Protein backbone atom coordinates (compact mmCIF):
# COMPACT_ATOMS: atom_id res chain seq x y z
CA UNK A 1 0.00 0.00 0.00
CA UNK A 2 2.85 2.31 0.79
CA UNK A 3 4.50 1.67 -2.59
CA UNK A 4 1.25 2.52 -4.39
CA UNK A 5 1.05 5.86 -2.60
CA UNK A 6 4.60 6.74 -3.59
CA UNK A 7 3.90 5.87 -7.24
CA UNK A 8 0.73 7.96 -7.38
CA UNK A 9 2.52 10.88 -5.76
CA UNK A 10 5.31 10.68 -8.35
CA UNK A 11 2.78 10.66 -11.21
CA UNK A 12 1.00 13.67 -9.76
CA UNK A 13 4.22 15.63 -9.39
CA UNK A 14 5.22 14.78 -12.96
CA UNK A 15 1.85 15.98 -14.31
CA UNK A 16 2.04 19.15 -12.24
CA UNK A 17 5.49 19.93 -13.66
CA UNK A 18 4.35 19.47 -17.27
CA UNK A 19 1.25 21.58 -16.73
CA UNK A 20 3.27 24.39 -15.18
CA UNK A 21 5.51 24.50 -18.27
CA UNK A 22 2.65 24.80 -20.78
CA UNK A 23 2.15 28.09 -22.63
CA UNK A 24 -1.08 30.02 -22.45
CA UNK A 25 -1.77 31.38 -25.98
CA UNK A 26 -3.01 34.60 -24.35
CA UNK A 27 0.56 35.16 -23.16
CA UNK A 28 1.92 35.26 -26.71
CA UNK A 29 2.24 38.88 -27.84
CA UNK A 30 3.70 41.05 -30.61
CA UNK A 31 3.44 38.40 -33.34
CA UNK A 32 4.69 40.06 -36.51
CA UNK A 33 6.48 39.58 -39.81
CA UNK A 34 9.30 41.79 -41.01
CA UNK A 35 11.08 42.05 -44.35
CA UNK A 36 14.86 42.16 -44.19
CA UNK A 37 16.33 45.67 -43.94
CA UNK A 38 12.92 47.21 -43.19
CA UNK A 39 11.76 48.71 -39.90
CA UNK A 40 8.09 48.07 -40.64
CA UNK A 41 6.34 45.18 -38.89
CA UNK A 42 3.17 43.55 -40.21
CA UNK A 43 0.71 40.82 -39.23
CA UNK A 44 1.11 39.31 -42.72
CA UNK A 45 3.96 38.74 -45.15
CA UNK A 46 3.64 38.84 -48.92
CA UNK A 47 6.89 38.56 -50.83
CA UNK A 48 8.82 36.83 -53.58
CA UNK A 49 9.88 33.23 -53.16
CA UNK A 50 13.53 34.17 -52.47
CA UNK A 51 12.84 37.24 -50.36
CA UNK A 52 14.30 37.29 -46.84
CA UNK A 53 11.91 37.83 -43.95
CA UNK A 54 11.43 36.96 -40.31
CA UNK A 55 8.67 36.09 -37.84
CA UNK A 56 9.03 37.28 -34.25
CA UNK A 57 6.94 37.09 -31.10
CA UNK A 58 7.11 37.48 -27.32
CA UNK A 59 6.02 35.08 -24.60
CA UNK A 60 5.16 36.72 -21.30
CA UNK A 61 7.17 34.38 -19.13
CA UNK A 62 10.60 34.24 -17.56
CA UNK A 63 10.97 30.68 -18.86
CA UNK A 64 12.84 29.90 -22.06
CA UNK A 65 10.62 27.32 -23.74
CA UNK A 66 11.75 24.86 -26.39
CA UNK A 67 9.65 25.90 -29.39
CA UNK A 68 9.58 24.58 -32.96
CA UNK A 69 8.18 25.72 -36.30
CA UNK A 70 6.24 23.62 -38.82
CA UNK A 71 5.36 24.85 -42.31
CA UNK A 72 2.45 23.79 -44.52
CA UNK A 73 1.84 24.62 -48.19
CA UNK A 74 -1.83 25.51 -48.87
CA UNK A 75 -4.17 25.87 -51.82
CA UNK A 76 -6.13 28.99 -52.75
CA UNK A 77 -8.65 28.36 -49.93
CA UNK A 78 -5.91 27.92 -47.31
CA UNK A 79 -6.49 24.19 -47.07
CA UNK A 80 -3.45 21.92 -46.90
CA UNK A 81 -2.27 21.24 -50.46
CA UNK A 82 -1.51 17.85 -51.99
CA UNK A 83 2.22 18.58 -52.19
CA UNK A 84 4.54 16.56 -49.99
CA UNK A 85 7.01 18.43 -47.82
CA UNK A 86 10.02 17.81 -50.08
CA UNK A 87 8.19 19.37 -53.03
CA UNK A 88 7.93 22.82 -51.46
CA UNK A 89 10.73 22.92 -48.87
CA UNK A 90 14.44 22.66 -49.50
CA UNK A 91 15.76 21.07 -46.32
CA UNK A 92 13.29 20.42 -43.52
CA UNK A 93 11.05 22.00 -40.91
CA UNK A 94 9.98 20.95 -37.40
CA UNK A 95 13.10 22.80 -36.31
CA UNK A 96 13.81 24.17 -32.84
CA UNK A 97 13.87 27.97 -32.65
CA UNK A 98 17.34 28.80 -31.37
CA UNK A 99 17.20 32.58 -31.71
CA UNK A 100 15.64 33.89 -28.50
CA UNK A 101 16.49 36.24 -25.65
CA UNK A 102 15.03 37.09 -22.26
CA UNK A 103 14.03 40.58 -21.22
CA UNK A 104 16.30 42.49 -18.88
CA UNK A 105 15.32 45.09 -16.33
CA UNK A 106 11.73 45.37 -17.61
CA UNK A 107 8.47 45.62 -15.69
CA UNK A 108 6.94 42.77 -17.71
CA UNK A 109 9.14 39.68 -17.98
CA UNK A 110 9.12 38.12 -21.44
CA UNK A 111 11.15 36.00 -23.85
CA UNK A 112 11.57 37.23 -27.42
CA UNK A 113 11.76 34.69 -30.27
CA UNK A 114 12.80 35.30 -33.87
CA UNK A 115 12.88 33.04 -36.95
CA UNK A 116 14.49 34.14 -40.21
CA UNK A 117 13.80 32.69 -43.65
CA UNK A 118 15.42 31.31 -45.64
CA UNK A 119 17.80 29.75 -43.11
CA UNK A 120 20.31 26.89 -43.01
CA UNK A 121 17.52 24.37 -42.39
CA UNK A 122 14.60 25.70 -44.42
CA UNK A 123 14.16 27.45 -47.75
CA UNK A 124 11.23 27.50 -50.17
CA UNK A 125 10.97 25.81 -53.56
CA UNK A 126 7.37 26.69 -54.48
CA UNK A 127 5.34 29.87 -54.54
CA UNK A 128 1.89 29.88 -52.98
CA UNK A 129 0.00 30.21 -49.73
CA UNK A 130 1.75 29.04 -46.58
CA UNK A 131 0.92 28.51 -42.92
CA UNK A 132 3.60 28.49 -40.24
CA UNK A 133 2.73 26.81 -36.94
CA UNK A 134 4.63 27.35 -33.70
CA UNK A 135 4.50 24.31 -31.44
CA UNK A 136 5.92 23.54 -28.01
CA UNK A 137 8.08 20.61 -26.95
CA UNK A 138 4.97 18.49 -26.31
CA UNK A 139 3.65 18.97 -29.85
CA UNK A 140 0.90 21.41 -28.85
CA UNK A 141 0.26 24.29 -31.24
CA UNK A 142 0.81 27.73 -29.72
CA UNK A 143 -0.29 29.81 -32.71
CA UNK A 144 -0.20 29.92 -36.51
CA UNK A 145 0.21 32.64 -39.12
CA UNK A 146 -0.36 32.86 -42.88
CA UNK A 147 2.07 34.21 -45.46
CA UNK A 148 2.27 34.32 -49.25
CA UNK A 149 5.23 33.74 -51.56
CA UNK A 150 4.89 34.64 -55.23
CA UNK A 151 6.77 34.62 -58.53
CA UNK A 152 6.77 37.45 -61.07
CA UNK A 153 5.02 35.58 -63.88
CA UNK A 154 2.49 38.30 -64.76
CA UNK A 155 1.99 42.02 -64.43
CA UNK A 156 -1.19 43.36 -62.88
CA UNK A 157 -2.63 46.80 -63.57
CA UNK A 158 -5.24 47.97 -61.08
CA UNK A 159 -7.68 50.82 -60.83
CA UNK A 160 -9.68 51.65 -57.71
CA UNK A 161 -12.87 53.69 -57.92
CA UNK A 162 -15.72 54.67 -55.66
CA UNK A 163 -18.77 52.48 -55.60
CA UNK A 164 -21.38 53.34 -58.22
CA UNK A 165 -24.13 52.72 -55.71
CA UNK A 166 -25.02 56.03 -54.07
CA UNK A 167 -25.80 54.48 -50.69
CA UNK A 168 -22.30 52.97 -50.49
CA UNK A 169 -20.30 55.70 -52.22
CA UNK A 170 -18.36 56.59 -49.05
CA UNK A 171 -18.04 53.03 -47.79
CA UNK A 172 -17.25 50.68 -50.67
CA UNK A 173 -14.92 50.67 -53.65
CA UNK A 174 -14.71 49.02 -57.06
CA UNK A 175 -11.45 47.37 -58.11
CA UNK A 176 -10.72 46.92 -61.82
CA UNK A 177 -7.65 44.93 -62.84
CA UNK A 178 -5.89 43.60 -65.91
CA UNK A 179 -3.50 40.62 -65.90
CA UNK A 180 -0.76 40.44 -68.52
CA UNK A 181 1.30 37.21 -68.68
CA UNK A 182 5.10 37.46 -68.86
CA UNK A 183 6.58 33.98 -68.65
CA UNK A 184 3.46 31.88 -68.47
CA UNK A 185 0.58 30.83 -70.75
CA UNK A 186 -2.86 31.29 -69.21
CA UNK A 187 -5.05 28.51 -70.54
CA UNK A 188 -8.72 28.82 -69.65
CA UNK A 189 -8.13 31.79 -67.29
CA UNK A 190 -11.74 31.80 -66.10
CA UNK A 191 -10.89 28.60 -64.22
CA UNK A 192 -7.13 28.77 -63.67
CA UNK A 193 -6.89 32.39 -62.49
CA UNK A 194 -8.29 33.19 -59.05
CA UNK A 195 -8.38 36.63 -57.50
CA UNK A 196 -8.80 37.71 -53.92
CA UNK A 197 -8.81 41.22 -52.45
CA UNK A 198 -7.53 41.60 -48.89
CA UNK A 199 -9.05 44.17 -46.58
CA UNK A 200 -6.70 46.01 -44.22
CA UNK A 201 -3.94 43.41 -44.71
CA UNK A 202 -6.08 40.64 -43.24
CA UNK A 203 -5.77 37.22 -44.85
CA UNK A 204 -8.71 35.70 -42.96
Regions found by a protein language model. Name each.
Residues 109-121, 127, 134:
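Ligand-binding face of N-terminal immunoglobulin V-set domains in extracellular IgSF glycoproteins
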Residues 23-26, 149-174:
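Low-complexity, Pro/Ser/Thr- and charge-rich linker/hinge segments at domain boundaries
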Residues 61-65, 123-124, 184-190:
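A short beta-turn/strand-edge loop motif at beta-sheet boundaries
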Residues 126-138, 194-199:
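Internal, hydrophobic beta-strand segments that form the core of beta-sheet-rich folds
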Residues 76-78, 136-142, 202:
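Short acidic/polar inter-strand loop motif in beta-rich domains
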